[in-house]
UniProtKB/Swiss-Prot annotation:
It catalyses: hydrogencarbonate(in) + chloride(out) = hydrogencarbonate(out) + chloride(in); sulfate(in) + H(+)(in) = sulfate(out) + H(+)(out); oxalate(in) + chloride(out) = oxalate(out) + chloride(in). Residues 466-580 form the STAS domain. InterPro entries: S04_transporter_CS (IPR018045), SLC26A/SulP_dom (IPR011547), SLC26A/SulP_fam (IPR001902), STAS_dom (IPR002645), STAS_dom_sf (IPR036513). This is Sodium-independent sulfate anion transporter. It comes from Bos taurus. The chain crosses the membrane at residues 48-68, 70-90, 116-136, 144-164, 194-214, 247-267, 301-321, 338-358, 371-391, 395-415, 439-459. One of its GO terms (molecular function) is chloride channel activity.
Amino acid sequence: MSPPMSPMKPPKGFAPMSCCWSTETMQKWLPFLGWLPDYTWYALKMDFIAGISVGLTVIPQALAYAEVAGLPPQYGLYSAFMGCFVYFFLGTSRDVTLGPTAIMSLLVSFYTFHEPAYAVLLAFLTGCIQLGMGFLRLGLLLDFISCPVIKGFTSAAAIIIGFGQIKNLLGLQHIPRQFFLQVYYTFHNIGETRVGDAVLGLVCMVLLLVLKLMRDHVPPVHPEMPTGVRLSHGLVWTATTARNALVVSFAALVAYSFQVTGYQPFVLTGKTPEGLPDAHIPPFSVTTANGTISFTEMVQGMGAGLVVVPLMGLLESIAVAKSFASQNNYRINSNQELLALGFTNILGSLFSSYPVTGSFGRTAVNAQSGVCTPAGGLMTGALVLLSLDYLTSLFYYIPKSALAAVIIMAVVPLFDTKIVKTLWRVKRLDLLPLCVTFLLCFWEVQYGILAGTLVSVLILLHSVARPKIQVSEGPMLVLQPASGLHFPAIETLREALLSRALETSPPRSVALDCTHICSIDYTVVLGLGELLEDFHKRGATLALIGLQVPVLRVLLSADLKGVLYFCTLEEAEKYLKQEPGTQPYNGSEDSVPEHKIALLKA
């Protein structure tokens, strides 16, 4: 159910700090000040329901994602609550929930060597980097990671994460974590499958699938429905929304039933420390049996993770925020989202959190529950803290196969098969970065993302260096570049002009239509100067038409000799025919039309 109107009012912009903190400035830095004065009892009720729903989802997921990250289960819960509280103050989306995710947990497992100290330090450094990007407004770096690269990465990650849980689903032991070795040893040791784990895991997967299908097909409730029908609808909706908690509780109950009989056919999660860890600064060194590992050595060990983890965290979080903002008709502030995520990771690291980001699945639960403001996260965070205080003794009985089922069912939607058909229909060349990213991610995630991004940038540069040039015949030959003109493209333009105009007999005059050119650089100016000389030597004319003001300003500053520019093609053709009353604009601002002069001086 969705509320008729939310009191959430995200800020329109992100203003720099000033010495005078006005109310508007305060609301931009602390968005909750904008919607809190208008908070209603209706919003409180809906936020409470949404917070409970998300809390029942995040607790079993957090335990499961800690396994993906290669960390003890309690670290998933340590990572699940701080974002709820920080986002209340700093977030600009009413739907987003921050916490552990499958993708981020996978990245953590690659760069932290399954050592909690490394994971906590990575969270701190990730937060610092994200915070710096937010203050410096460097979110634009994410624009260079194209959609095919993201889809290739998430699809590969879904396979890596999903297959990584087969060992827990089947109760296999001593399986390496490197993907290719994992595949080999999983099939090699398939004969050691524990029947109890396999049966329970498959039953949990079936239950999760059935409950999800029920959730997707529950008809909307209407006020005119009888009370009994609405009550039944609420019960079904609650059960299907909290399906992860329901299925994990069922599995734990089954395991406990066997435990009291003295026979245990399942591999259990085991003892989980009670309570929240004491707040402390992240470890900047680690003492092992072989000696002390310094901060510098820890950072060197993380390597590319200090780039990949912050960027992918930002990308995932902002993608989720933008998706639900568009779906629910409100706006977010991307730079403010960076700050919220950065502060979450920094403060979370004080309580042994590993890096977190926005969760698409839990955000969807939040939105479908009718959340009105980020206040819903307060209830989610409170539930996680309560579970750490009072439920950790019960986590002992949760079978690992049940958590594996939760993870597998959570990552299945990440594998996007439709994107291949869409790209084949829209632009087949975009399949190249998708495939490069997808394949190389099985080797190393950072290589996949880097190679895919590089291929995407090369495709972009190719279109810049080889712009399409439309040619029209007439009294003058008209060449119109279909996009901007920058230094890699000057040789393409030269080749087109030489082959179409100067290498013909006799040489032809050309009008270069600059309608689509909004900027040029110094190399282009030099290239145009050389072309003007070539045309002059062969007794032909090169005229520029449709110049935009920024381009005209650059040409005037360069003081090119012999450059002719006209407002329209008709004026250029009249000048070529030497019809009276037509003169080119060249030489200085004195010859430029009055409306252009006004724009130049504006």
